[in-house]
Protein backbone atom coordinates (compact mmCIF):
# COMPACT_ATOMS: atom_id res chain seq x y z
CA UNK A 1 0.00 0.00 0.00
CA UNK A 2 1.39 3.39 -0.92
CA UNK A 3 1.66 6.23 1.57
CA UNK A 4 -1.04 8.91 1.63
CA UNK A 5 1.35 11.88 1.48
CA UNK A 6 2.96 12.23 -1.95
CA UNK A 7 4.34 15.78 -1.85
CA UNK A 8 3.88 18.02 -4.89
CA UNK A 9 4.39 21.76 -4.65
CA UNK A 10 1.86 22.72 -7.35
CA UNK A 11 -0.99 20.77 -5.75
CA UNK A 12 0.00 22.19 -2.34
CA UNK A 13 -0.21 25.75 -3.69
CA UNK A 14 -3.50 25.12 -5.49
CA UNK A 15 -5.23 23.59 -2.47
CA UNK A 16 -3.77 25.62 0.37
CA UNK A 17 -2.31 28.70 -1.34
CA UNK A 18 -3.26 32.34 -0.79
CA UNK A 19 -5.35 32.69 -3.94
CA UNK A 20 -7.44 29.61 -3.23
CA UNK A 21 -8.02 30.90 0.31
CA UNK A 22 -9.12 34.29 -1.04
CA UNK A 23 -11.49 32.64 -3.53
CA UNK A 24 -14.04 31.50 -0.94
CA UNK A 25 -15.71 33.14 2.03
CA UNK A 26 -14.56 30.38 4.37
CA UNK A 27 -11.00 30.76 3.08
CA UNK A 28 -11.04 34.49 3.82
CA UNK A 29 -12.26 33.62 7.31
CA UNK A 30 -9.23 31.36 7.77
CA UNK A 31 -6.89 34.15 6.65
CA UNK A 32 -8.50 36.67 8.99
CA UNK A 33 -8.24 34.26 11.90
CA UNK A 34 -4.57 33.60 11.17
CA UNK A 35 -3.95 37.35 10.92
CA UNK A 36 -5.64 37.94 14.28
CA UNK A 37 -3.55 35.16 15.83
CA UNK A 38 -0.45 36.94 14.54
CA UNK A 39 0.82 34.15 12.28
CA UNK A 40 3.87 35.18 10.28
CA UNK A 41 2.96 32.73 7.50
CA UNK A 42 -0.72 32.90 6.51
CA UNK A 43 -0.84 30.01 4.06
CA UNK A 44 1.20 27.64 1.88
From Swiss-Prot:
Lineage of the organism: Bacteria, Pseudomonadati, Pseudomonadota, Alphaproteobacteria, Rickettsiales
Highest taxon above the source species: Bacteria
GO biological process: translation
Cellular compartments per GO CC: ribonucleoprotein complex; ribosome
Alphabetical list of PANTHER family matching this protein: LARGE RIBOSOMAL SUBUNIT PROTEIN BL34M (PTHR14503:SF4), MITOCHONDRIAL RIBOSOMAL PROTEIN 34 FAMILY MEMBER (PTHR14503)
Family: Belongs to the bacterial ribosomal protein bL34 family.
Keywords: Ribonucleoprotein, Ribosomal protein
Protein name according to UniProt: Large ribosomal subunit protein bL34
GO molecular function: structural constituent of ribosome
InterPro entries: Ribosomal_bL34, Ribosomal_bL34_CS
Amino acid sequence: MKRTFQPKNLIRKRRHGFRSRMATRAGRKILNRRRSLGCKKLCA
